[in-house]
């Protein structure tokens, strides 16, 4: 271990933003970049002419619909730290891609629409974070509007999400009467003014909740605030760093992302409290972030980030050591050495060549089809990082094309989209039609649009009478062959070459499992691990 690597690892913070759709996640992403100095005004990257679309929403379908469909990666410096921010799809139909992104972070920022409280997608995503005890910071957004009672919101988070809340700031009013927040730990009041371009130093601060100036500023509100703070301090949890790092307690902040209010406090908490890169599990051993040798894993593949180049980028989370441009690294699944000369880092779709990267950083490797999600890279050691799952799809469609001459383009397009995780592709063992599996309907719309725009293929999706999929495996090859022969009509091969059972309904799946006790039916499978 070198002191240089240790110092660089300590400076890193890698986190994702998770939320239900429309809670204000993309707005918050923009504002974090604005406050860090990474961009000059929300929606435009510093020095680049990117139009008026959000920095992190770069795919055409995202621009049309105003949702984050793909996960983007943004790196910026703040307070002598390097921050890697992973923006995740907020739309409920994109949970599988979001799950995978959560395997590449060390902490998460949960955004809640304070008018609505805890919503379905938030519950799913927090459950994924809980699998890895990921520390969570919470931001209650939209206090410039009429919202629900703040104590009620804390109770809801604790009861539904089963994580204890420690309010760090507390709101003064809401909607038209929103005056600001009181910072409980700092004993300061930050005064709210509407306006999306206001920067941190432009908000007024009053020191001390007993400051006489507050009677002049808020003659009607100040006594209620003091009473509320007394109640909150008596009834809620104090912030405890160890409990936060264990994923048991979440610090809670209140504000209005669209008005830049409450953003700096969140950034400071992520720098001061969130963990630096942590050790990662691999099949042979635990890999420490400050080891001398480079290693990392692929958690996402994005096709055609640059429409002009029609390329694919594999997103790699660095787990240990130091990456240097031009170094040789081994692609372990196929046992091939590659010279990493054109590796990039991101500000959404704006790319810069990487000279060096450390644990916690996300780098992009140009991919011509050899790299898959879950692949591990090292300087030679046979490491395979674990914990990057595929989830069983919930919706299925058969796919056909209007122009049979374009069958090769269809197959190529679906292969690429399958590899990047936009959709799961199954080739039935009997029958010609390919079957697509997804977590939500919008994924099929995205695939239709991308097949047309990127591959020139007009595809038609028909409903498929499939209830769910299970990957199957068996140690006894003879038994597996018998199972395949008896169930050929329900079996398919996925994009990774794995055998899957496509069940028409719940009863069928249950009966099949009973009839074949030696066959293991898996609801998830590890990426790049052949069952």
From Swiss-Prot:
> A GO molecular function for this record?
GTPase activity
Q: Where does GTP bind?
A: 19-26, 87-91, 141-144
Q: Tell me which CDD domains the record gives.
A: RF3 (cd04169), RF3_II (cd03689), RF3_III (cd16259)
Tell whether Cytoplasm is among the UniProt keywords: yes
Biological process (GO) annotations? Answer: regulation of translational termination
Query: Which PROSITE patterns does the UniProt entry name for this protein?
Result: G_TR_1 (PS00301), G_TR_2 (PS51722)
Q: Which UniProt keywords apply?
A: Cytoplasm, GTP-binding, Nucleotide-binding, Protein biosynthesis
Which NCBIfam families does the record cross-reference, listed alphabetically? prfC (TIGR00503), PRK00741.1 (NF001964), small_GTP (TIGR00231)
* PANTHER family reported for this sequence: PEPTIDE CHAIN RELEASE FACTOR RF3
- Physiological role: Increases the formation of ribosomal termination complexes and stimulates activities of RF-1 and RF-2. It binds guanine nucleotides and has strong preference for UGA stop codons. It may interact directly with the ribosome. The stimulation of RF-1 and RF-2 is significantly reduced by GTP and GDP, but not by GMP.
What is the name listed in the Swiss-Prot or TrEMBL entry for this protein? Peptide chain release factor 3
What organism does the UniProt record list as the source? Answer: Neisseria meningitidis serogroup C / serotype 2a (strain ATCC 700532 / DSM 15464 / FAM18)
Taxonomic classification: Bacteria, Pseudomonadati, Pseudomonadota, Betaproteobacteria, Neisseriales
